């Protein structure tokens, strides 16, 4: 008899091996009965056969025991996922004939209904268009879902709504885009709504609940698909009647329904329905004194206006803009929610504007409203919203904001200059919108800076410079050259004329000069007049600034970089950052690049000189600028730069020979360092004619005595191996390159390790067959590098190991088939297990784990069993580093490989693992416990418990009870009616790290469930209450008279957390920062006493330090209090730590205080 398919087999095994009492037995009984029936009938155990057998059980639903009913449908939900779609589609009427009668059974509860509804969803999603339009099966199923969607049972009601929404959002392929079921799906709820809306007598609570349920159902339908046009008028009429009944919840649901109608009208271009919706909304405007209803109405109006602007722009402009005044008066409200939503709605109204004269008349009226509001005390609270509206107007009108919005700009400037005005940040954002819209030149005509100080009565606006800096783009570069360059010169001249350069006026003027030049990157962001404004005169000014003002070099270089990058992106038709449209065409940008190319030679010469004279910590902007300009330079220019660098390089290397001096901060590094950095930047833009020379330089650099030169040599090699001509040369000379790298292996130091690994990785990415024979020679270095402290070096080592494995797996040198090659490669790695050092052995185990995870589908079961048995021996190692790596490998094996591979080895694995469960240091003890928990979930507690000796039975008993308790908690917390909000899983650098360091499945599931439940808020108007329970296992008895004392309006968990933090200070901690808690009550009392004593001692020490310590006060003449201003060196010394720096020409930097490292030592 054929077996069921593997995924279904795994799922069935999981539920049958579940360790929870009650659940496991019933699932096992049902599955065993089904399989026994299939064997008796000599039927193949396919998913379809399971489905038929389970449907037979469903026919006998009334005869089943209560617990078996829910489990039968859960199994049915599981099995139906693996049944072929064509079978479910063809046999849907027969399946439904079995499922439909279950609805009428009085004993049906949520344990049955939830999987029942899931089965129904699966069946309906598979039906084609003809099934929906012909026959009654689909219609019957929809009526079943509508029945539960209107029920009072929350979980089944919400799940039914989710299923209906999912079905309507996924219509079958057919002649129309909307779902064919929407007609009868919408008709029944609407008919019920009309009957409830027209009822004149007061409604009972049950009728109110039914009304709200029907409104929620219609809201789901409207937001999922297009409401039938023939029913829109009837729905709007019912909405008007319901709003007249003045039920807050019902009115909010009405607004949400109309909001959904507006959204879907856009998707289906139904302007008629949208017009009826907007008319209905205008009739249903609530009182401005009701914030809840007003916010809901404004949201619906906002959606309707935006939809109208998409479908019918002309009508929207005239029908929506006349409501601006009515909307604007709502900004007087004291409710912040109303003001915020009003501003959003007004911005949508502004979106209906265009650049025609009629719109400009409306803009002038809107601007007048805003100016009057900013002067009116009634709108004092609405200033932020007014600024938001002004910004929206500027973004919509663009350059046309001048002159129509200039009055608003003047009012804003007046407000910012007022004393006591506290909204300057918001004003700056609004003014920034004006800068982006009309440009800096027009802005400064309205609001001049007045920095010349020619007119004593003029108001200075130095605060405007940072606003300009952050918002200038697509401007005229001529404005900077004609206005700001002379202004900067005047201010700088005043600085020079001052005698004291350290005086406050001098520093203020220098700050203004720096702020003026900080505007240049904005002016260089795709300027409109580049070719006419970027003259030789302006270029000479930039060169002088680069040479003379060191503090402005980064600004100038960033400007030159932006000039090239923005034009390059536009020329290549790539989007600019956060910019939808640009005012420069691709052809104009290409012309600009050609213009800049003619100037690149001169600029590169200057930049090379400046680069060599700049301290290393300030070089990055210059180096990036050089790289950017080389990109657009001609081949002759690139060759000229290359020749300059290489001509100076030999002498500079000779000057550096035998020198290990490290340049201090603020001092330029040796010339050789600068030249090699430039060579690395230039090399990607050269061609194959330079390949031989460049690789000769690599040879020379790698053999240099200076480690910094070696590091740069590896960087140059890595760069060459990633460009086309370098790859071509390396492919032909791969053997020589590898021999060169092998010959300098003994010269490698920690600072060059990462770059060497990157070069080797780039070499193996070529996948040359000549490198296969070198694998045994390179593997030890790659393996030991897996234990590098530097994270980037460690990740590069993993990449190198995988590339080596890829070469081996693709080579016939390791076997004839892929499984054989993988196993042989793992065997080659296993040679490292015989290493003499702890590091090498643990690194080898990590390497084996990584390769096994990467190629697990090719590894045979016998080889895997042998591998696990071998590494099992290392679990008992006395070296924690080795044991940890071996335990991680076992964890990977348990997680990734079939049960049959691991189960036979449990008698050997578990005793060895238990040896570490008694470890005093908690790291391995917790790791082993988590591994046992994972085994218990996968194999079942009953399978692993026999291998626990008597003295360790307590551990497995605790694990079993913990799992059962977690299952009960999740069962109580799980709410299928609420949508899942699972957190995104953390990503890792490799499959090995994902398997070893990822969160435990069960713990993650608990976390996600807790997050889901904690995130679901109740009624926003209801005060929050907290219940404090003494025992987690026994829920609070609310009928008890003492229950009142357990309910609080404040969260008791905060006090409990503070109390725990206080108690935790009494416990000892191990080297990993974990608390060590003794089981003895006496020890706890001793620890508490010690904690109290330490607390009192700390108070006393602090007091004595305050009155008699180094920083205490003294009394001087006339009994005045004096404090010492001397800095005590001992108080400020920080621990030095080695850090990897890009270049050894810098001093080792002082490391900042590292709390994570030093926190383990009691700091």
Swiss-Prot record:
Q: Where is this region: Disordered?
A: 1127-1163
Is this entry keyworded Nucleus?
yes
* Compositionally biased intervals (Acidic residues): 1131-1141
**Major location, coarse class?**
nucleus
What family is it from? Belongs to the RRP12 family.
What role is this protein assigned?
Required for nuclear export of the ribosomal subunits. Required for maturation of the RNA components of pre-ribosomes.
**What is the protein's name according to its record?**
Putative ribosomal RNA-processing protein 12
Origin species? Schizosaccharomyces pombe (strain 972 / ATCC 24843)
